[in-house]
């Protein structure tokens, strides 16, 4: 595909960024459709559904719903790996998440793919790059054998906001890229996804310490299905979501880029949020699956997955 060729050429001049095997992962909520907390059995059912596509999920705040202590044994029983999250924006949540991980991780290190400190923290302006780097280093000291990193919007890598993290040697960098929230029509959305990743990856490669190879993957991308809210030229709908998935996400996987799809299942408990345009936006219809784990579209990329 031309997008893949363009991405390959863009990164060929900046070889420090290393992409993995093109595996699909999912952002996974920790609450049931009614807003109650999931238990271990719920996570196991989630994994049974998702294993047809991939065996990695990411969450955002380890203490939320006591999720870390529940999802790790579920992952171990089903052959999954988990990217656990720490929410550092508020000191209370930061400490609670670290404490939750201190209890949950020992004995389950084999199913912890990484720990992310923050999700779009730089994008929201809650930390500077140096401030977030300090938090990441604090967590790395607590979990010396676990890969520690962060996730942020593609433009915060591309515009230099995240330079301190890259230059500081952070080894795990997730790049969130939503053509939908950039207001792109579906016809332009797959190319926008590639352009976003190229912009972030080139900056990461240029700023990474000599000899280092930070792991770079798409941390979040997706498209709302039927029932979702439009955003400018970006129109919600299941057909558009499938098109974006097949022409954008699947193409990335075919090229060899790992990607986390946002999200695994609808979350009907979520309240509306206010977008950058000031309008209320629905966040309950972003799942590849409905809240009761029914598929919305055929998610078979027809690409060969690398064996672990």
Curated annotation (Swiss-Prot):
Residues 1-20 form the signal peptide. Glycans are attached at residue 126. GO terms for biological process: carbohydrate metabolic process; cell wall organization. Its EC number is 3.2.1.58. Induction: Expression is down-regulated in presence of human keratinocytes. GO terms for molecular function: glucan endo-1,3-beta-D-glucosidase activity; glucan exo-1,3-beta-glucosidase activity. It is found in: Secreted; Secreted, Cell wall; Cytoplasm. It holds the Pfam family Glyco_hydro_17. This is Glucan 1,3-beta-glucosidase ARB_02797. It comes from Arthroderma benhamiae (strain ATCC MYA-4681 / CBS 112371).
């Amino acid at each position: 595909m031309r997008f893949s060729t363009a991405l390959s050429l863009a990164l060929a001049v900046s070889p420090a960024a290393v992409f993995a095997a093109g595996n699909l992962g999912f952002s996974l909520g920790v609450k049931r459709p009614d807003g109650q907390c999931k238990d271990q059995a719920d996570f196991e059912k989630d994994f049974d559904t998702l294993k047809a596509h991939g065996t990695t999920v990411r969450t955002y705040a380890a203490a939320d719903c006591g999720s870390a202590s529940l999802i790790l044994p579920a992952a171990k029983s089903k052959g999954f790996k988990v990217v656990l999250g720490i929410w550092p924006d508020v000191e209370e949540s930061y400490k609670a998440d670290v404490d939750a991980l201190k209890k949950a991780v020992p004995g389950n290190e084999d199913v912890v793919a990484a720990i992310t400190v923050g999700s779009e923290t730089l994008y929201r302006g809650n930390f500077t790059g140096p401030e977030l780097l300090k938090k990441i280093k604090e967590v790395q000291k607590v979990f010396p054998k676990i890969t520690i990193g962060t996730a942020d919007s593609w433009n915060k890598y591309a515009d230099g906001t995240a330079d301190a993290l890259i230059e500081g040697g952070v080894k795990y960098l997730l790049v969130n890229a939503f053509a939908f929230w950039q207001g792109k029509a579906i016809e332009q959305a797959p190319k926008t996804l590639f352009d976003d990743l190229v912009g972030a990856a080139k900056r990461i490669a240029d700023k990474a310490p000599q000899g280092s190879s930070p792991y770079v993957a798409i941390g979040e991308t997706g498209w709302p299905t039927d029932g979702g809210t439009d955003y400018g030229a970006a129109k919600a709908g299941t057909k558009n979501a499938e098109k974006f998935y097949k022409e954008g996400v699947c193409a990335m996987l075919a090229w060899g880029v790992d990607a986390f799809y946002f999200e695994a299942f609808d979350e009907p408990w979520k309240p509306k949020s206010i977008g950058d345009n000031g309008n209320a936006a629905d966040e309950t219809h972003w799942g590849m699956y409905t809240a009761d784990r029914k598929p919305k579209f055929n998610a078979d990329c027809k690409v060969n997955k690398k064996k672990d």
